[in-house]
Amino acid sequence: MSNNMLRMVAAVAVWTVFAAGTAIAAGKGEATYEKDVRKIVSENCLSCHGNDAPTMEAFKKDQEGFKKTMKGPRMDTYANLMIMVNGSDTGALMRRLDDGKSTKEGKPGNMYTYLGKTEAEKAANLTVFKEWVGGWTLKRQKEITEGELKAIKALEK
């Protein structure tokens, strides 16, 4: 790939991330599940995390079995998604969607790759999720502080 082509790809990626963040910050108000997140989940996640997927409770009982059938915990509703944001599996959504910039190893979460078809789309969708969550943390329920929990916005409407 030529230097000019690389510059063009980088410029498009930066512009996409900037535009996504700006659209949320200006004019649209705070990011919400209904307005911003639901569409991303529908387009990128529901083939494995839809209404035919197991509840979190059922998934925990047979994770390997469900993984073999390409089924993860159900994310088809706001309530089901919130289990992985600040519920019984606090931080799971953030750990799995993170691009690796929140870890010392720099390794993206195992579901980051499904956030979009291109790096620019993945980055833009991650920006939306981060704005929606607010207090983006990779900590588990037993590790998270009260202040960090309060920083999680994750508005439904």
Set out the residue ranges of the language-model regions.
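Bacterial N-terminal signal peptides that target proteins for export
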Residues: 1-12
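Aromatic- and Gly/Pro-enriched helix-to-coil junctions and flexible linker segments
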Residues: 25-157
